[in-house]
Amino acid sequence: MAKGKDARIPVLLECTACVRNGVNKESTGISRYITQKNRHNTPNRLELLKFCPYCYKHTIHGEIKK
């Protein structure tokens, strides 16, 4: 039997500090994490505090479109 739309969807989290600063000159790249969220419990965009290896500190990572 087929189910309806799944409640859990994969999302990409991207460092907001790297995007705003245009990435450090020493390192190229933007920190991204893949996680899941429940569409019914969190309908708005997800923001989590994660470690960014390019900024060398914990920064806010926000949900982006695929």
From Swiss-Prot:
The keyword Plastid applies. One of its GO terms (cellular component) is chloroplast. GO terms for molecular function: structural constituent of ribosome. Transmembrane segments: none annotated. GO terms for biological process: translation. It comes from the Eukaryota. Keywords: Chloroplast, Plastid, Ribonucleoprotein, Ribosomal protein. Pfam families: Ribosomal_L33 (PF00471). It is found in: Plastid, Chloroplast. The keyword Kinase does not apply. Its main location: plastid. PROSITE patterns: RIBOSOMAL_L33 (PS00582). PANTHER family: 50S RIBOSOMAL PROTEIN L33, CHLOROPLASTIC, LARGE RIBOSOMAL SUBUNIT PROTEIN BL33C. Belongs to the bacterial ribosomal protein bL33 family. NCBIfam families: PRK00504.1, PRK00595.1, rpmG_bact. This is Large ribosomal subunit protein bL33c. It comes from Helianthus annuus (Common sunflower). The gene is rpl33.
